[in-house]
Amino acid sequence: MIRLLITLGFMGYTFFAVAQTGAWQQRVNYKMEVDMNVNTNRFTGTQRLDYWNNSPDTLRRVFFHLYFNAFRPGSMMDTRSRRQGTIQVGRGADWDGRVKDRIVNLKPEEYGEQTVRVLKMNGRVQQLKEHETILEVVLDNPILPKSKVVFDLQFEGQVPLQIRRSGRDNPSSKVRYSMSQWYPKICAYDEDGWHPTPYVGREFYGVWGNFDVKINIDKRYILGGTGYLQNPQQIGYGYELPGQTVNRPAGDKLTWHLVAPQVHDFMWAADPEYIHRTLKIRDSIPATKTSPALPALTLHLLYKPTNEKAENWEKILPDAARALPFIEKHFGIYLPVIGTEGGPVLDIGFSNDTRYPKMSEEEHAQQSVEICQRMMTGKVPDYFFAN
């Protein structure tokens, strides 16, 4: 028996080594332009998606997530949420009380919606099959191994009332828009194949790549999001560099241009009453014989003063500044792939208790300072693994 176990152990090591030498993962580049109507809570957009099939497989179909379609009566998320507590899992009931019957009671203007009107691959219109929160694309030509294709999408949607993870008019924080999982997102493909997982409330699996996003929204709204703002001089609201003149274009809307390199997702939040605070952690420091170069680093805080304890958020930035040296000591220096004028940014936008690349959302300001501190120190390290 011992000899058999040793033999199997060596066999397992051999298979593992072989698998590792052939390791691969897909790669994407997203370029999106979105127009948001704050009166109807609807948006339209275009997406150009460069997709690299680095796998050894020929792909005859691709899949996209349409997450907002979960937030309407009769969806899988709605059905599951209304059954919570009735299904036995292990020693207890499967229970998550955050959704319950909130979806089934939504009115049509409160539903979530995500629709891809047209999808082209390399300029040719493709056949689409929508399965609630998953879009299946039947390709007219397969994507060969080690090749690249370009998808062009025209899409539209409606932002649902805040139910979970994403939405509008958060009943707790009062933040107007918390836009996570808001765009048609290509599903992950790995050694196990496609992962077209229907959205019923769990975590999100994505493909690493670059995002270039333009968001056109009412100019009264202040926005924070994944990535680095490319046009701060046209935006202002505290994003402009010291001494820089803000020159906003004419019209009722502003276009926020954000670029995020080497991340697996993109989110943003916006509200006309956001207060924007910044804290410069350091200027760039050149490398020495004993230490690596350090990039310039600024922390950004967006919060909405909705209650008497809103001043707790003002303590977050200095707390984050004190926590960062410990985090960098144990996890490494926070290094973006590229920098922009003003240096890399950590966005901390508070509304929804979620975290995404370069941005985290919370809604704990009504709690004690200690709870805010614990949440902050727990979320900042996420940036080191999400971008």
Pin down the residues of each PLM region.
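N-terminal signal peptide c-region/cleavage motif recognized by signal peptidases
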Residues: 12-14
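N-terminal, polar/Ser/Thr-rich
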Residues: 17-44, 171
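Short beta-strand elements of extracellular/lumenal beta-sandwich folds
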Residues: 41-54
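Short, hydrophobic/aromatic-enriched beta-strand segments in well-ordered soluble domains
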Residues: 47-49, 66, 147-161, 211-219, ...
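A surface-exposed beta-strand-loop module
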Residues: 52, 92-172
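Solvent-exposed beta-hairpin/edge-strand motifs
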Residues: 61-124, 179-180, 216, 220-221
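Glycine/proline-rich low-complexity spacer/linker segments in large multi-domain proteins
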Residues: 76-89, 156-211, 281-282
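Hydrophobic helix-coil surface modules that form long, contiguous segments used
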Residues: 186-193, 201-387
